[in-house]
């Protein structure tokens, strides 16, 4: 088991920040600045991600970068789950999505660059590095 795998196995993390950057370099928050969420990593290498807008009204007034982000805003919620593998050398976590609120995610592989510092987990989308999520590990 690698270092990242050891750190996340059997843990739950709380969302601190979910942000993206538009084409003009402006920071946007696809589900609002106060989005809430959890990410769970099981001991048998499965992941479950749930993120929601605090107000869930779907009206953020932001022009989104992708159809998936538009769908998230409409619903005020994003969730997906499936088995994952970690490339410890490249520091990439890749999830094979089995279930998702966004139908285009089902059957896809979602790759995230991983960085850890203490009880903080930083994930960024490999294909869209402007999308960043910050998580804090929940205490046992």
Please describe what each predicted stretch is.
Residues 1-140:
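Lipid interaction determinants
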């Amino acid at each position: 088991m690698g270092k990242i795998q050891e750190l996340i196995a059997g843990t739950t993390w709380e969302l601190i920040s979910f942000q993206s950057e538009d084409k003009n370099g402006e920071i946007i928050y696809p589900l609002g600045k106060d989005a809430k969420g959890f990410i769970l990593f099981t001991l048998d290498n499965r992941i479950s991600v749930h993120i929601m807008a605090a107000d869930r009204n779907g009206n953020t007034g932001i022009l989104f970068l992708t159809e998936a982000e538009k769908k998230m805003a409409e619903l005020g919620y994003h969730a997906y789950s499936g088995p994952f593998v970690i490339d410890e050398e490249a520091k990439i976590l890749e999830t094979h999505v089995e279930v998702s609120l966004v139908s285009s995610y089902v059957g896809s592989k979602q790759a995230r660059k991983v960085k850890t510092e203490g009880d903080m987990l930083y994930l960024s989308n490999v294909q869209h590095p402007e999308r960043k999520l910050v998580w804090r590990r929940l205490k046992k």
